């Protein structure tokens, strides 16, 4: 009985739904595990909501790929074998855990990128823009009129698709053999042309 009780209080990996994003600026979300533990007598025990769970997304200390997270999104929870309270508080070097707990529900991390199969982002019909499974794609606002994307084609081409496209910077350099403009060209300020001369914009 004691071993069974101890196992009941240990967690390893569970899907969950996001129930709170008020601490998203800190890289944490509130989640509710969605699969309970079924016992031989037919009863089920559902874990409680877990607050302030750190998000796992591609990042280093100085670079990151940042995704918006909303209530209703799904995540995959993994649970540390040791108490991560000190680590969450900023301890980056080797240290002793603050408690003796093992695989505890309070030591969860939330991995983004888990969805039911019927909500797969690989499904072309879920995309407003044309989609190929052979391409590498960064997409936002999936399936809406505001869908935009950066697409690395299997052919070696690159496509940017958006309602409006803006470069912000002090300079922009294009080292290409040819630039083809399929629409109107509006210049605000001065445009210097190779071969001499300035063209004044509006």
Kindly give the residue locations of the regions a language model identified:
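Hydrophobic packing positions characteristic
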Residues: 1-163, 168
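Intrinsic-disorder/coil detector with helix-boundary
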Residues: 153-202
């Amino acid at each position: 009985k004691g071993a069974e009780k101890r196992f009941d209080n240990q967690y390893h990996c569970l899907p969950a739904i996001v129930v709170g994003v008020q601490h998203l600026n800190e890289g944490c979300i509130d989640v509710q595990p969605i699969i309970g533990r079924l016992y031989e007598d037919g009863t089920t025990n559902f874990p409680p909501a877990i607050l302030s769970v750190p998000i796992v997304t591609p990042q280093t200390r100085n670079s990151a790929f940042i995704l918006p997270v909303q209530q209703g999104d799904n995540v995959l929870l993994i649970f540390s074998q040791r108490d991560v309270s000190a680590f969450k508080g900023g301890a980056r070097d080797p240290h002793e855990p603050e408690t003796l707990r093992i695989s505890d529900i309070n030591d969860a991390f939330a991995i983004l990128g888990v969805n039911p199969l019927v909500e797969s982002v690989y499904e072309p019909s879920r995309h407003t823009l044309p989609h190929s499974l052979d391409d590498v794609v960064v997409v936002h606002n999936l399936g809406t009129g505001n869908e935009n994307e950066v697409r690395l084609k299997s052919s070696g081409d690159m496509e940017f698709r958006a309602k409006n496209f803006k470069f912000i910077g002090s300079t922009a350099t294009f080292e290409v053999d040819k630039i083809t403009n399929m629409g109107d060209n509006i210049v605000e300020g001065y445009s210097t042309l190779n071969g001499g001369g300035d063209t004044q914009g509006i």
